[in-house]
Amino acid sequence: MSDEEEYSEEEEEVPVDTKPRHSVIVVEEKGDPEFVKRQEQKSSALDEQLKEYIAEWRKQRAKEEEDLKKLKDKQSKRKVMRADEEKRMAERKKQEEERRVREIEEKKQRDIEEKRRRLEEAEKKRQAMMQALKEQKQQKGPNFTIQKKDPSFNMSSAQIERNKTKEQLEEEKKISLSFRIKPLEIENLNVDKLKVKATELWDAIVKLETEKYDLEERQKRQDYDLKELKERQKQQLRHKALKKGLDPEALTGKYPPKIQVASKYERRVDTRSYDDKKKLFEGGWATLSSESNEKVWKSKYELFANRSKSKLPKWFGERPGKKKGDPESPEEEEVKADAGVDDELEEPTFEPEPEPEPEEEAAEEEAEEEEEEEEEEEEEEEEE
């Protein structure tokens, strides 16, 4: 049920509610006049409220009808716009499908033409070969021709580019520029065509600049990759050389290292030079062993000769096996000291000393022990 039908039912119900009230008032008019008066006042107040409610309801209904009308208008406009959009989309899809079909047909046509061209070239080559064979049979000469060797036969394209002279490069540059740079031909063009020509040139400049930037970035990236790969290869070669017991820079040089001979029994890498190995086969093992023994004995002799030489105590007496530079014994020192003064004196005669008593002998022994300890301490201090 629509809103209009509901509203019409409410309008019909309102007067139905008011009729019994009037009938009640008519029935009660026969009673107390004051009561009747109050009832009339109440009925009039209710009628006014009802009228206000009806007026408010009609305003609200008119507003809702207006909003509903606006919504219906928007809906109809949206339907029209959607239909137009669907129509445009269908047209665009149709054009896209036609373009795709046309491209497929053009590609097929190009493939057919390319195949026909290859077949024609193959047929021409075959006919030329047959003609050459016929001429050869007629001439009855050698079936081959020796051509002069091109100097750039075994050279790569990069080597050929590097070996080109300056004049050749200039000539190639002129030829390439003549293909790329075309004449403008703007003599008989009006303003609109000149604008179109300017936009075309601007687009070409933008395209060339973008290609230039892309190539520069690609070159930077490739240079970085090459540096990284070279460094990685260098590190791997260093580790490989260290594993083989070689110098870390042995494998990174211009020439490869010499072949290392591994011991069959010890499973060790032989790091000796070629000359050392050659001496082994020439009977140099004895010389090597003698040289090593001489080095050992020489080092021991140097340690013995450079030892610290201490002075002997006076009670030691004469040193046996005295050599040049060794400290003299106490007797020799006293003899040298007295030699300069008492050379002309006669040798004195001494009387035998009396035998000492036991107490004196013990005291002398203690004194001698103390002197020995003092001399040992002095020698230790001198050595330090």
UniProtKB/Swiss-Prot annotation:
Top-level division of the source organism's lineage: Eukaryota
Function text: Troponin T is the tropomyosin-binding subunit of troponin, the thin filament regulatory complex which confers calcium-sensitivity to striated muscle actomyosin ATPase activity.
Protein name, per record: Troponin T
One BP term from GO: regulation of muscle contraction
Keywords: Muscle protein
Family affiliation: Belongs to the troponin T family.
Annotated stretches, region: Disordered: 1-23, 61-169, 237-257, 313-384
Biased composition range(s): Basic and acidic residues: 61-74, 81-126, 316-327
UniProt source species: Periplaneta americana
UniProt cross-references to InterPro entries, sorted A to Z: TNNT, Troponin, Troponin_sf
GO cellular component: troponin complex
Gene Ontology molecular-function annotations: tropomyosin binding
Residue spans of biased composition, Acidic residues class: 1-15, 328-384
